[in-house]
């Protein structure tokens, strides 16, 4: 029996996790937390808001599934990593912002870090047990979001409702907007660097509208290995919770005889500059990914509130990065301080852009 603590229980990932737990008697939900919605009776221990690490201390879980949105998930990620508790990570922002500090905590703790992002779950399966010297590169796929194929000029008047209409995935509002700007893929690029210890120049991104191929690994002999499956988050959630076993899910295998078409293309960097901004921040190192993430969270929230135009998201992120020095953080306290500084700067820049 695995004891599961679910953080972010009322979001998209949280709800799908509950489905998986209900279907697997070997999984026991011992604790659940949400940001603001009531969850009384969902688990023996529940919490709304507050310090999630206190809940984790009381719950003593075998696995923490962190589906908190944004930087707020950072303390829970570090709690699990430092204690060697298996971490099923949907909160990519905590690894992006935590960077080298998170990796060091993971190495000290010695537990498993199992990504819940579909692309990184696929990459984990493709890379596991494979000697890194045999790997040429990792390819992450992006659906292209709801605005795939549009030019930059076509995006000036995009409204939040349009950005939230994702063509293939069912996700929460923040990650759906990130998908529309391609920032989500930028964050995933940085996440892949830290998860798999791959240099940035060996991580590629391609647009794949059907979201059937989740990741590919190119090998040095010229061969490529791909992970295919329906775009359904219950598959990577189940994989992370039941690892190293592989349990059944209600998701059917692909019907390869049904005229499956696999289309790939290059991202449009002019229309969607967030991907390039993320790559540059990752390559810069230090706390640049933390600043990138904080500025993006501020800008996306302003866009969803109708205060910032869609194209302003990338502008706020770029200007925030240009205004802040990003030295490496020596500890979690410095990381939190850098996040706060980036949010103040991004908020001020947002006000300037809309007035």
Predicted regions and their residues:
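Catalytic, metal-anchored helix/loop core of enzyme active sites in primary metabolism
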Residues: 1-42, 47-355
């Amino acid at each position: 029996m695995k004891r599961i603590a679910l953080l972010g229980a009322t979001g998209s990932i949280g709800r799908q996790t509950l489905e998986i737990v209900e279907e697997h008697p070997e999984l026991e939900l011992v604790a659940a937390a949400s940001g603001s919605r009531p969850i009384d009776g969902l688990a023996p221990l529940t919490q709304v808001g507050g310090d999630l690490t206190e809940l984790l201390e009381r719950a003593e879980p075998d696995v923490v599934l962190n589906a908190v949105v944004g930087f707020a998930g950072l303390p829970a990620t570090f709690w699990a990593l430092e204690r060697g508790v298996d971490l099923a990570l949907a909160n990519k922002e905590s690894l992006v912002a935590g960077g080298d500090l998170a990796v060091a905590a993971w190495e000290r703790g010695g537990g498993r870090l199992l990504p819940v992002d579909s692309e990184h779950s696929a990459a984990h399966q493709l890379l596991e047990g494979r000697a890194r010297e045999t790997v040429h590169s990792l390819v992450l796929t992006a659906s292209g979001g709801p605005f795939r194929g549009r030019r930059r000029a076509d995006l000036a008047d995009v409204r939040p409702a349009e950005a939230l209409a994702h063509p293939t995935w069912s996700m929460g509002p923040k990650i759906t907007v990130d998908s529309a700007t391609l920032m989500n893929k930028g964050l995933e690029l940085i996440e892949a660097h830290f998860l798999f210890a791959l240099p940035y120049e060996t991580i590629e991104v391609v647009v794949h509208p059907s979201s059937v191929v989740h990741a590919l690994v190119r090998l040095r002999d010229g061969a490529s290995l791909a992970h295919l499956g329906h775009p359904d988050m219950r598959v990577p959630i189940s994989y992370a919770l039941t690892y190293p076993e592989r349990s059944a899910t209600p998701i059917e295998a692909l019907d390869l005889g049904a005229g499956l078409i696999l289309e790939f293309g290059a991202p449009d960097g002019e229309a969607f500059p967030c991907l390039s901004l993320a790559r540059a921040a990752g390559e810069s190192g230090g706390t640049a990914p933390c600043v990138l993430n904080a500025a993006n969270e501020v800008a996306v929230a302003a866009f969803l509130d109708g205060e910032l135009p869609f194209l302003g998201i990338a502008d706020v992120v770029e200007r925030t990065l240009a205004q802040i020095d990003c030295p490496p953080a020596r500890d979690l306290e410095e990381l939190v301080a850098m996040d706060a500084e980036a949010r103040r700067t991004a908020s001020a820049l947002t006000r300037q852009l809309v007035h």
